[in-house]
Curated annotation (Swiss-Prot):
The keyword Iron-sulfur applies. Its EC number is 4.1.99.22. [4Fe-4S] cluster 1 binds at residues 20, 24, 27. Gene3D superfamilies: Aldolase class I. The gene is moaA. Transmembrane segments: none annotated. The keyword Cytoplasm does not apply. SMART domains: Elp3 (SM00729). SUPFAM superfamilies: Radical SAM enzymes (SSF102114). This is Probable GTP 3',8-cyclase.
């Protein structure tokens, strides 16, 4: 399905929980508030089934910390059984060492692990937890079991900015395939943390110079740089960036049952909780959810647009 701004809808981002075992000072919580209701595995799979009918073929699981959901492995298995081509997850990696193999067996295709530091000290300053070594173990397990490509997310801010180039080195040594250098978004706690924002301009200029190839990804038109080692560095700069929004192919399912059309917008949402909780047959629920998707696609609009 294409929205009225010509953007295809291809990707469903599902928040599985708001609970987290870390306290990152900038956490945007996927732009969600309130979690009086937590969608069940059945709710999630039903919405995913309907999304699939709209041509959506890739799912990203997120949170909170998705590995804290006890039914995570079953959710992944259910998504693959629905026929999703690409099922991936973003995690803080704390529980990954023991989960990686189970997730791989359930069909998880690939993984993003957030690692915002190259040392125990900075890691703790950012996440509030002394877990750097443990997350590194998790990353190694993901590589070992073949959850590839393994990508690392690094949200750049004043506490870790000086570590970016060492982070690239560390990633190369670990053997990960790709890293994402992400601009801090002013959403959730990110609003307060925005004073520590870095626009990534200088960092990107330097990376471009040392790279051997530049590519532009279809999703968000994100620039990617291939380094001589083969490591891919993707630069994620959404803030006040109309080009990024023009390439947005994503819709979000919030943990409390809303179709959220944009990370930044709290108004552009369709509440589907009544449908999910309603005493309807599954066929009727599917029909109603389909209509909700149609409305969500109709109201979807880029948050940052060029002014004419
Ligand atoms: N707990 C998991 C994790 O940290 O990877 C998944 C949820 S987290 C909200 C999803 C991604 O958003 C992570 O890579 C995290 O670093 C990133 N993130 C969180 N707050 C952010 C912010 N204010 N700006 C940019 N990225 C942010
Ligand atoms: Fe937890 Fe992820 Fe938010 Fe950090 S960014 S507090 S790990 S949900």
């Amino acid at each position: 399905m294409i929205d009225r701004f010509g953007r295809p809808l291809e990707d469903l981002r599902i928040t599985l929980t708001h609970v987290c075992n870390f306290e990152c000072f900038f956490c945007h919580m996927e732009g969600e508030e309130g979690d009086n209701y937590i969608l069940s595995k059945e709710d999630i799979l039903l919405v995913a089934k309907v999304a699939k009918n709209f041509g959506i073929n890739s799912v990203k699981l997120t949170g909170g910390e998705p590995t804290l959901r006890r039914d995570l492995v079953e959710i992944v298995r259910g998504l693959k059984q629905l026929g999703y081509r690409d099922v991936s997850m973003t995690t803080n990696g704390f529980l990954l060492k023991d989960l990686a193999y189970k997730l791989k067996l359930a069909g998880l295709d690939r993984i993003n692990v957030s690692l915002h530091a190259i040392s125990r000290e900075t890691f703790k300053k950012i996440t509030g937890v002394d877990a750097f070594d443990r997350v590194i173990e998790g990353i190694k397990s993901a590589i070992d079991v073949g959850l590839v490509p393994v990508k690392l997310n690094f949200v750049v801010n004043r506490r870790n900015r000086e570590e970016v180039f060492k982070f690239i080195e560390l990633s190369q040594n670990l053997g990960v395939n790709e890293i994402h250098l992400i601009e801090l978004h002013p959403v959730g706690l990110g609003k307060l943390a925005f004073k520590e924002h870095d626009d990534l301009r200088e960092i990107e200029e330097y990376i471009e110079k040392i790279s051997i190839k530049k590519q532009i990804r279809k999703k968000h038109f994100r620039p990617r740089y291939v380094l001589p080692s083969g490591l891919i560095v993707e630069v994620v700069k959404p803030y006040a960036n109309p080009i990024f929004c023009a390439g947005c192919n994503r819709i979000r399912l919030s943990v409390d049952g809303k179709l959220k059309t944009c990370l930044y917008r709290e108004d552009n949402v369709i509440d589907i909780l009544d449908i999910l909780k309603g005493e309807y047959s599954e066929d009727v629920k599917e029909e109603l959810l389909g209509r909700a998707f149609m409305i969500a696609i109709a109201i979807r609009e880029p948050n940052f647009k060029y002014k004419i």
